[in-house]
Structure formats: C-alpha cells, structure tokens
Amino acid sequence: MPLADYFVTVQKTNTRGRMANNRQESIEKIKELTEGIDFCMLTTIDGGHLRSRPMSTQQFEFDGDLWFFTSDNTHKIDEIAKDNRINVAYSKPDDNTYLSVSGRAEVVKDKAKIEELWSPVLKAWFPEGLDDPHLCLLKIPVEQAEYWDAPSSKIVQLFGMVKAIATGQEADYGENKKIQL
C-alpha cells in the first residue's frame, strides 16, 4: 500500500571524499541517477532488525527531502515512531547505477502538503483519494547519500578490466561518491 513522490538535494563529494559546494550540481547528479527509477526500497528499524519494503516514486521539484505517501496505520509508521532512522535505496541495474540515501523520517499530516503532492495515479494505492482518513506523508530530510555510477556498456567495462590487467593499474569502475548534507 506504500508509495509515491520523492526527491532529494545534496552536496556532492568527489571520489576521494572532498566536498564540492555546488548545490545545483548535486541536484542535477541526483536527478540523473534517479531518472527512470520507478521503485526504491525503504528500510526502517524494527526491534533492532532491518525491515525493507518497495515504494513507488514520482519525480517533482525538490529541496533536499524525500516524500512518500503512505497510510498512518502501517507497520512502517509504527517502526518510525520508535526509531526514525531510515535508508532508501535506488537501483538501475541496466545502467549500473545505484544510490543509497539515509535520514530521519517524519510523519506529515498537513492537508495542504498532501494536496500539493497528490497525483491521480495514487488512487491505485489509496482508493479513497484525498478523503482517506489514514493518508499521510513520510518526509525524509536527506542527511547522507552514496552512489555508484559505472559505465553502462558491458564492453566498456570489459575493456577497462583487460586494460587494468595489461597495465597493472587498478580498473576504473566508475564513480563511487559519498554525499553529506
């Protein structure tokens, strides 16, 4: 029954971990990494154990927060009430792109915000629409992120491995960067 709208703003670090202060560049990188990803996995903590579930995403303008529609009577809401630390993982295997973000979730029942983010496609999860008494949002201000973005062509990857073996140098497997807000 979970679901929907998200997006993030972050500061980007380079491969060696130094911080780049260009906020717009960071926004564009996250947009690029998440473009075309329909589902992510939202992970909560349940009695010391990790519990994940798929969530559907839609893109819209963002300011550093992930937003998801959900119902206030779900296990994840109970888990967040006890420990609001979460992780959201995105994956696009065809492009060898992976993104992991973490933050602290907040339950938001602000009707104006719900209406602002609402999309008719959400009726698939919430048949009562905006009149659903359990409808709420999860707001996740992103604190940290890490991504892996490798060349998408298997031939390019294979060439890089062969070149590394031939030259004795480490293969370039693409970018792996940590992002700290």
What kind of feature is each model-predicted range?
Residues 62-67:
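Short active-site oxyanion
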Residues 14-41:
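Active-site-proximal "nucleotidyltransferase
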Residues 79-142:
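Short, structured beta-strand-loop surface elements
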Residues 48-57:
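A positional/architectural concept
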Residues 57-60, 92-94:
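Short, charge-patterned binding micro-sites
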Residues 70:
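Ligand/cofactor pocket segment of small-molecule handling proteins
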Residues 2-18, 135-181:
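C-terminal edge-of-domain segments
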Residues 32-47, 86-90:
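A short, Trp-centered hydrophobic/proline-enriched beta-strand micro-motif
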